[in-house]
């Protein structure tokens, strides 16, 4: 059994503060045979989560505390950069921001489900704890990072 309590969360915050990445996750799987990913993630302002997508799974995100924004992008295959909303170009693939979802339990906005295949990242406004779940083992789930 894994007990999710203040002691665990405080320990994760301490590790996130000490981390250059300004974040720390905690694996909630209880068996190496478990095919899905379920984790707590502590995120601090200034952390850089690369834009990425999970082609084979939705990503379920619940915010337990703090405040962050889930940013979603759509693809625009084109050879020219157009408009200020275009983030960058990699191999002719342009990404355009199309949605920002505030996750803030203090105002009743608890989470979201990022559809399979949608490019996304997060912007952390306040130190936050999120629960993430998606199908597939880490490294075998088809996750793609944009621009790398």
List where the protein language model places each region.
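Conserved metal-binding segment of the jelly-roll/cupin
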Residues: 103-126, 133
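A short, N-terminal "cap"/entry segment at the start of jelly-roll beta-barrel domains
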Residues: 1-36, 50, 81-102
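Conserved short histidine dyad/triad with adjacent acidic residue
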Residues: 40-55
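Structural motif
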Residues: 48, 67, 127-129
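A short hydrophobic beta-strand segment most commonly corresponding to one strand
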Residues: 60, 121, 127-143
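Short hydrophobic/aromatic-rich beta-strand segments that constitute the beta-sheet cores
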Residues: 50, 70-72, 132
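Glycine- and acidic-residue-biased ligand/ion/polar-headgroup-sensing regions
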Residues: 56-78
């Amino acid at each position: 059994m894994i007990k999710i309590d203040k002691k665990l969360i405080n320990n994760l915050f301490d590790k996130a503060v000490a981390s250059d990445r300004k974040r720390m996750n905690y694996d909630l799987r209880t068996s190496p045979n478990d095919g899905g990913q379920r984790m707590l993630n502590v995120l601090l302002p200034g952390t850089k989560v690369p834009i990425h997508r999970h082609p084979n799974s939705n990503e379920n995100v619940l915010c337990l505390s703090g405040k962050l924004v889930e940013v979603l992008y759509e693809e625009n295959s084109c050879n020219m950069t157009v408009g200020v909303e275009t983030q960058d170009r990699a191999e002719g693939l342009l990404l355009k921001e199309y949605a920002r979802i505030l996750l803030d339990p203090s105002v009743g906005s608890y989470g979201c489900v990022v559809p399979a295949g949608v490019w996304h990242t997060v912007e952390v406004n306040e130190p936050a704890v999120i629960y993430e779940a998606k199908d597939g083992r880490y490294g075998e789930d088809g996750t793609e990072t944009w621009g790398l």
